[in-house]
């Protein structure tokens, strides 16, 4: 239970700090934008990132995602970081397979899901660029949180979840009436709990 309570603690910490900064800025005559818009009520992982730590998400999008090509083009660095991450993780998992096979299964499964998200996409060329650039952005965003393997894996999990959601959304568009689908009600909390502990 404590592991899942940590997701609430992270939100309260970050949102609380942001609200204090907004309040102090107002006392000095400055208006700062809202930094959290009830992210845990999001319909999907993409919307979550539009509502969570908006200043960081905007910075990552403007200065990392667009810099490595965004949806338009692929760059060396856009392909390099995800390839390096998956390659290093696979090498590590193979190296420790005498102790346990679980990291190897997880790594191969994550790589398979990432490739599958590209292969089943309606526009493969665009999704290759987009998914690799998004994965690079999330890996570097994880590294920004801390130079620790757990933050890099956290970034990779979010990059993978975003790639899967983008491909999934091509086949099952979001309802325009604002209501959450049954699938969204199941998958959103699952992705959040898995990636935030």
Go through the PLM ranges and name each one.
Residues 1-197:
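Membrane-embedded transmembrane alpha-helical bundles that form the catalytic cores
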């Amino acid at each position: 239970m404590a592991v899942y309570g940590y997701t609430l603690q992270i939100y309260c910490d970050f949102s609380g700090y942001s609200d204090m900064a907004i309040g102090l800025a107002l006392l000095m005559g400055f208006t700062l934008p809202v930094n959290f818009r009830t992210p845990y009520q999001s319909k999907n992982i993409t919307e979550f990132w539009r509502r969570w730590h908006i200043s960081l998400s905007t910075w990552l999008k403007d200065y990392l995602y667009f810099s490595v090509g965004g949806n338009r083009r692929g760059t060396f660095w856009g392909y390099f970081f995800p390839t390096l991450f998956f390659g290093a993780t696979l090498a590590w998992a193979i190296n420790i397979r005498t102790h346990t096979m679980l990291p190897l299964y997880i790594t191969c499964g994550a790589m398979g899901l990432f490739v599958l998200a590209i292969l089943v996409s309606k526009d493969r060329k665009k999704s290759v660029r987009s998914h690799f650039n998004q994965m690079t952005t999330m890996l570097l965003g994880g590294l920004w949180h801390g130079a620790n393997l757990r933050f890099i894996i956290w970034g990779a999990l979010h990059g993978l979840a975003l790639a899967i959601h983008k491909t999934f959304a091509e086949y099952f568009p979001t309802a325009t009436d604002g209501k959450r689908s049954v699938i969204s009600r199941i998958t959103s909390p699952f992705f959040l709990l898995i990636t935030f502990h």
